[in-house]
């Protein structure tokens, strides 16, 4: 199982998510890196940045309050990017955004994907961050984004997205999946968990994104 980061923040019950990650690692072979959301938490242990409820950082503050010492210790063990070699298959390079930029967004930044693939010394690049499922090839290299389980940007909404990679004849063949799930139950958890009291406007953007598949959260952040 390959995981590309952004495991918690901006959602209810982050401690439950962490427990599921620990269980997954016990039961399966996992290759994991961390994303920008984990960076935010690691950089603010003890709330050095002064995050507050009912502010632009409210949901981050909520998550920070629910993190345990073992969660921070676990995040510290995860690299921001790494290569992955599986016998008989081409080398994969894993990153959250782009190599060297955990917040590099090939879906929003014009020309970034082309630049990254041109310079990439690996045949395959797996990236996340944009939450947008896609595959593209150029310069003899391939970029794959499996999408997002918890916050898919697909202009449809109410789906969890991921990809299955199959090694075939010295190449990787991805199958992209988009699975409907109980979004209404998830939305109720925002209220039941208390996170809605922390996030305010951003939480409304997140919940609208979950229903529509449009990244209102990203555009809300840009507007702040």
Question: At which residue positions do the language-model features occur?
Answer:
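Active-site neighborhood of phospho(di)ester-bond hydrolases with catalytic His/Asp-centered motifs
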Residues: 1-6, 31-36, 94-95, 124-131, ...
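Core catalytic region of metal-dependent phosphoesterases/phosphodiesterases
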Residues: 1-69
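Active-site environment of divalent metal-dependent phosphoester hydrolases
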Residues: 9-12, 37-42, 100, 126-137, ...
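Active-site-proximal segments of metal-dependent phosphoesterases and phosphodiesterases across multiple
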Residues: 50-54, 88-120
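Metallo-beta-lactamase
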Residues: 55-91
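Conserved hydrophobic/aromatic beta-strand scaffold that supports enzyme active sites
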Residues: 81-83, 94, 135, 162-164
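Anionic-ligand binding region
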Residues: 110-149, 160
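Acidic, His/Gly-rich catalytic cores of divalent-metal-dependent hydrolytic chemistry
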Residues: 138-224
């Amino acid at each position: 199982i390959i995981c590309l980061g952004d495991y918690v923040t901006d959602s209810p019950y982050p401690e439950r998510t962490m427990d599921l990650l620990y269980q997954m690692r016990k039961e399966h072979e996992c290759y994991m890196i961390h994303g920008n959301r984990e960076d935010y938490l690691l950089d603010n242990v003890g709330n050095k940045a002064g995050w507050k409820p009912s502010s632009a950082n409210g949901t981050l503050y909520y998550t920070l309050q629910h993190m345990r010492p073992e969660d921070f210790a676990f995040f510290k063990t995860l690299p921001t990017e790494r290569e992955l070699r599986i016998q008989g298959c081409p080398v994969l390079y894993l990153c959250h955004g782009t190599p060297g930029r955990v917040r590099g967004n090939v879906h929003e930044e014009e020309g970034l994907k082309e630049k990254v693939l041109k310079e990439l010394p690996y045949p395959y690049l797996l990236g996340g961050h944009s939450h947008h499922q896609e595959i593209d090839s150029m310069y003899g290299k391939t970029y794959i984004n499996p999408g997002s389980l918890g916050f898919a940007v697909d202009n449809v909404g109410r789906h969890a997205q991921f990809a299955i990679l199959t090694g075939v004849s010295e190449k990787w063949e991805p199958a992209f999946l988009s699975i409907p799930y109980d979004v209404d139950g998830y939305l109720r958890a925002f209220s039941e968990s208390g996170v809605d009291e922390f996030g305010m406007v951003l939480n409304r953007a997140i919940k609208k994104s979950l229903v529509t598949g449009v990244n209102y959260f990203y555009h809300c952040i840009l507007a702040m």
